Regions:
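Bacterial Sec-dependent N-terminal signal peptides
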Residues: 1-23
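Acidic, metal/ion-coordinating pockets
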Residues: 21-361
C-alpha cells in the first residue's frame, strides 16, 4: 500500500511525493477478489456495547500482505446504501466495511458488479460519496455522465509507472441503472472506445477489471475467453476477473507480456460451501527499464475465510493458507482447519492449470 499518486484525466490527487525512477523501476501490485457483505458478516462486525460496527479484525491477518504491495485493488461487491443493513440478495453494508478495507491497505476499489444497483439510486450515489469521503479512489460507477467523462478511466501513478484502470459488469441482476448514474456494463463497442481513450493518456499499462463468467464454475466460460481475447487484442495488459465466487485459472503470456486472471474468488464472504470459502490474491511484479514497457511477472497467494464461533456469534478472519500450513497463526489455530486443507487442495488443483503464474513462496 505505497500508492504515490492517483490521477484522473482532468484531476490529480497527490498522495505522497514520487520517488525518482531508477534505471530499473520495480513496482508491486496486488489484486484481490470479491468483498461481500452477508448478514452474518454484518452481525459479526456489530459491537453490542458501543452499538457500532467494526470490521477491522476480519482483515487483521491478511493486512501485512496487502500493505506490502505498492498498489492494492479489490472488487467492492456491496453497496453502502445506509440502514437497514442487509446481506443477500440486495446488499447494504455499514460504512465501517469501507473503513476497514482502507485500513487493510487497499488503495483503490472497483464498484461495477451485479450488486451495484441493489440499493437503487441511493445505493449507487451513497456508495460513491462514502468512498470519496474516505479518499478511496474507485472506478466503474459514477454519479453522472459528466463525472464519467472527467474521471474515466482511473489513472494511477505508482512509483512512476502509470496505470489506466477500466471496470465493467455483465449485468446488475435485472435491476435498471438508476436514472442519471453511470454503471459500466460489458459492451464491446464501448469497451473498445474506452481502451482507445485510455491509450491517448499514454499509460504504461492498461488494467481491465471484468465482472463476468458463471457463478461457482471453476472453468472459464466461452464468453469469458472470447472477451479476454478481444481485450488482449485491443491492448489491455492486465485482465482481472471477478463474479464466479470461486477460483479460475490465471496465465501470463510472456511473449505478449499480458496477464489474464479469470476469477480470484471470494476474498471475504459468508458463503461456506466449498470451493466458495476461499480465494487467491494475485501479486504482480512490474519491472520497467527506462522508457520500455514494464515486464509483467505474477504469482498467487491462497486465502481462506476462517469462521470460528465465539459465544453466540460467528466471526470472520481472512487468513493466508500458507500461514496456517506453516503454523504462523497460533493465536487463532483451530481444530477445524480440515476445511481449509480441503479448500487448499481443490484450489491448487484449479491453479495447476495456470500458465506462468506459480504459487507464491
Amino acid at each position: 500500500m505505497n500508492l504515490k499518486t492517483i490521477i484522473v484525466p482532468l484531476l490529480a490527487i497527490a498522495v505522497q511525493p514520487l520517488k525518482a525512477q531508477t534505471a530499473d523501476s520495480v513496482v508491486t501490485l496486488l489484486f484481490a477478489g470479491d468483498i461481500m457483505g452477508h448478514d452474518s458478516q454484518i452481525a459479526a462486525a456489530y459491537n453490542d456495547s458501543t452499538k457500532t460496527y467494526d470490521y477491522t479484525d476480519c482483515f487483521r491477518y491478511i493486512k501485512p500482505y496487502v500493505e506490502k504491495a505498492d498498489f492494492a485493488l479489490a472488487n467492492f461487491e456491496v453497496t453502502l446504501a445506509g440502514p437497514p443493513f442487509k446481506g443477500y440478495p440486495q446488499f447494504s453494508s455499514p460504512d465501517a466495511l469501507a473503513v476497514a478495507v482502507k485500513d487493510c491497505g487497499f488503495d483503490a476499489l472497483v464498484t461495477s458488479n451485479n450488486h451495484t444497483c441493489d440499493g437503487g439510486r441511493k445505493g449507487v450515489v451513497r456508495t460513491l460519496d462514502v468512498l470519496d469521503s474516505l479518499q478511496i479512489p474507485h472506478t466503474g460507477t459514477f454519479h453522472d455522465s459528466a463525472e464519467f467523462r472527467q474521471k474515466y478511466p482511473l489513472i494511477v501513478d505508482v512509483k512512476g509507472i502509470k496505470l489506466a484502470i477500466l471496470n465493467y459488469t455483465y449485468g446488475t441482476n435485472e435491476l435498471p441503472t438508476p436514472k442519471g448514474t453511470v454503471v459500466n456494463r460489458i459492451d464491446k463497442h464501448n469497451i473498445i472506445n474506452d481502451i482507445a481513450a485510455a491509450k491517448r493518456l499514454n499509460p504504461d499499462l492498461i488494467v481491465a477489471c471484468m465482472h463476468w463468467g458463471i457463478e461457482y464454475d471453476t472453468v472459464p466460460s466461452r464468453s469469458q475467453m472470447q472477451m479476454a481475447e478481444m481485450l488482449k487484442k485491443q491492448g489491455v495488459d492486465l485482465i482481472i476477473g471477478s463474479h464466479p465466487h470461486v477460483l479460475q485459472p490465471m496465465e501470463v503470456d510472456t511473449a505478449a507480456n499480458q496477464l489474464l486472471v479469470y476469477s480470484l474468488g471470494n476474498f471475504v464472504s459468508a458463503q461456506r460451501t466449498a470451493p466458495r470459502d476461499g480465494a487467491a490474491m494475485v501479486n504482480v511484479r512490474l519491472t520497467k527499464h527506462c522508457s520500455q514497457k514494464p515486464k509483467i511477472e505474477a504469482d498467487y497467494l491462497l486465502t481462506y475465510v476462517h469462521y470460528p464461533k465465539v459465544g453466540d456469534k460467528r466471526l470472520f478472519y481472512i487468513v493466508a493458507v500458507a500461514d496456517v500450513e506453516n503454523g504462523l497463526l497460533k493465536p487463532i489455530q483451530s481444530d477445524n482447519w480440515g476445511r481449509l486443507s480441503q479448500f487448499a487442495k481443490d484450489a491448487r488443483e484449479v491453479m495447476s492449470r495456470n500458465t506462468n503464474v506459480p504459487e507464491a513462496k
